[in-house]
Design a protein with these regions (language model features):
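A structural "domain/chain start" motif
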Residues: 24, 28-29, 37-40, 45-60, ...
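Bacterial Sec signal peptide processing site at the extreme N-terminus
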Residues: 11-34
Length: 199
């Protein structure tokens, strides 16, 4: 009985340590969101458990590095000044906001060994998200207008996909719904089928 209990405890410790090691490796490899998700999952169960203390430190590190990486990418893409990058910039701002929203329910996280609360630098990205959403909608709308002028079935299909995306991120933008209807009608292949009964 003692051997079985000892074996169970040993396996449990091995699994716990490997999970921490996997989270550390994710951070080391630059997979910050994987590390954040793993740490959040563990801390959601019980954030005060002593065994979960390493996850708080890992979460702090991963959050800081992920935020710095995304903000660095945004700065670079803005300097590039290519309209094709607007969607990526918008997505990065959305990702920054989502990452913060995942952490908020867990706070405060207390680090026992350091006798302090975990520190997460939160920023309100709403203005940037709204500005980029407007800019992206305008860019895609002008792209759709160009595709419509080509008067080609495949371009109407591409236009429909762009219009659908605009409607998703910015509902009721200009006359997007009407253009979606037109793009769908002009992008559809109609096939005539006739049936004959033969014996």
């Amino acid at each position: 009985m003692k051997n079985a209990l000892l074996f169970a405890v040993l396996i449990f410790l091995t699994i716990s340590c490997s999970s921490i090691k996997n989270t550390q490796e994710a951070i080391g490899n630059g997979n910050y969101d994987v590390a954040i998700n793993t740490a959040v999952k563990k801390l959601k169960r019980n954030k005060t458990k002593k065994r979960n203390q390493p996850y708080i430190l890992l979460l702090e590190e991963a959050f800081e590095k992920a935020t710095a990486k995304d903000l660095g990418n945004i700065i670079f893409l803005k300097k590039d000044n290519n309209p094709e990058n607007i969607e990526t910039i918008y997505s990065l701002y959305e990702q920054l906001k989502r990452r913060q929203e995942v952490l908020k329910p867990l706070l405060p996280l207390y680090i026992v060994n350091l006798n302090r609360d975990a520190s997460f630098q939160f920023t309100n990205y709403d203005d940037e998200i709204i500005a980029n959403k407007k800019q992206l909608s305008d860019y895609l709308y002008s792209k759709v207008t160009t595709l419509f002028n080509r008067n080609n079935k495949f371009d109407y299909r591409r236009a429909y996909n762009d219009l659908e995306y605009i409607e998703k991120i910015n509902p009721s933008f200009k006359d997007v719904r009407n253009l979606m209807f037109v793009a769908r009608e002009r992008g559809v292949d109609f096939v005539i089928v006739s049936m004959k009964n033969q014996f």
